[in-house]
Amino acid sequence: MKKFFTLILTAFVALSASAQKIVFTDDISAGSVTGFEADGLVLSVVDDNGKQSVDSNNAYFGTATEYEKYDHRLKTGGKSGAANHITLTIPAGGTLSFGVRSASSGATDRNVVISQNEEVLYDQVVLEADAVQVLFEGADKETSIHPIRTVSVSAGEVLVEYPVGALNFYFFELETSTGVKSILTAEDVMNGKSFNIAGQAVNGNAKGMVIKNGKKFWVK
């Protein structure tokens, strides 16, 4: 029975998370970038000087053992300010992940700043030296794997700034909780509590699939 309860716990934890991801797939000329959307995650740009663009560029992000290739980037075209910046509309609180590189490989002072409600949540310098080197099978030289950066955000508007100089962004991904308030545990099952398939406690009038005492019931 303990093994059965463990399987239930694992399933509910997996169901309790979802993700929205913005990637760039097509070339867009400078001054023509408007915005992007992925399942409620919205990226908007302010580009009054017509410098932002999207072009083809291969880069890997992840770790030395687990990484993903991206083939387009959003180029900011300069440092941020009133006429050049990015905002993200966050549909629900969670973890924001993003891939970014400096537009100048030799720059050592270009930072990315993530803020919300005038509070700085993330402020780090972006360096090419942050990448790890991996030798792919059959390759003659190593490939750079750049780090994925993460920050916790709440629902609402998030401001993305690059106050020192131009940066290139490859993706933005938001992982959110689905709002499960209580997870089914072995103790809960033994106490006769009822839950829906998302792991939320329900009352005796609940309809549909209900789990009680470790068993599934369909209630009409």
Can you say where each PLM-predicted feature lies in the sequence?
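Residue-level detector of functionally pivotal "anchor" positions at catalytic/ligand-binding pockets or at interdomain
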Residues: 175-200
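C-terminal tail/sorting-segment detector
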Residues: 2-3, 209-220
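Terminal, low-complexity interaction segments
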Residues: 21-54, 60, 105-177
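Bacterial Sec-dependent N-terminal signal peptides
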Residues: 1-21
